[in-house]
Amino acid sequence: MNTVYMTNTRTLPPSLPFPEALMDAPMSITAKVLYARMLDEAMNRGRTDDAGKIFIVFPIREMAFTLSRSSMTIKRALRELKDGGLIRRDRQGAGKPNRIYVLIPEERP
């Protein structure tokens, strides 16, 4: 990876959104990075359901490839995110991929 110094005129490369609330969240780094990746996916390529809520379709195999992790590691991270209230997964059935709703942490007062 080539690097350069940051200056007032240098534009930043593409980056992932990372809510500050995740900094202290009791979950693995993999879960946090996966959340940031899914949030980016929802913001840029999300689909809208009948209620106007944005969801993504992001197969586990693709998540594993994107993060260079095993499918089992991704499944554990997804469980952490679900247990932490940061995602909701809806099964579609009939061999269709799950819908993943990426939930936004509320700001601290």
Language-model regions: role of each:
Residues 1-61:
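Short recognition helix of helix-turn-helix/winged-helix DNA-binding domains
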Residues 43-106:
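Winged helix-turn-helix DNA-binding recognition segment
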